[in-house]
Amino acid sequence: MPELARRGFVEGRNLQLETRFGEPNAIPALARDLDRAHPDVIVAVSNSVVHAVASAAPGVAIVASYFGSDPVAEGMAQSLARPGGRITGIAMLAEALDAKRLDILHETFPTMRRVAVLSGRPPRNEASIEAMRATAQRLGVELTVIEADSPREYAPAFERMRAARAEALVVISAPDFNRDAAILAQAAAAAGLPAICEWRDMAERGCLLSYGPIKEQLMRRVAAYVVQILRGTPPGELPIETPTHFESVVNKKTAASLGVVLPPVTLIRADEVIE
């Protein structure tokens, strides 16, 4: 909103915003409802939402905030440089970032051998899980994937982590896990699991570690896409961008509550340490 206003689009003056939120199984219906509002552009979070919106709103420009996995491989763009069609946005390439988070977790706790991964149900996160399995094999770590698609499934998910004797947790890249970060961080703490998450604000809400792009920078880029489309540029002519800056955050308060000692290298490499 502030970035759109800075670029000349102010809600109530020359901009009308419609928002829809829901669990994964509700997304197609929400996308159809949104299309009935006749938007000029739709901002969609994650590949599955982009697919749903593309199907429900066949004539509307779409800005992905963000593609989780490769939009070219999934047939949503001809190339990153020139996507063609009506979809553009930010490609997170989450599979590489999720595998990197497993690396960071292992570097922080090098003796751990059993790691849980909190994931959505297939087909969500499949590319990330495949990349993480390859990383786990290289590290000599046993990976247990636990699936949950809504808050009511979190408690049983953490029970399964306990049953698997997990020693740490990777919360996979997903918008709903970001939304529920405080709930997940509390559950991880109750289970005695050091957790690494996606965004800085997830560490601020209680995850032990986070590693990912700088959200504020990405949102400015998403706003720039929206403005260019509203001013007449076809989305297919706007290159799909990938993040270029990443940050690592450590929550020492969470470390203290878990009773874990963080190695100096983890603290030295962190862009921010929450005391």
What are these regions (language model features)?
Residues 1-275:
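Short hydrophobic alpha-helices and adjacent helix-cap/hinge residues
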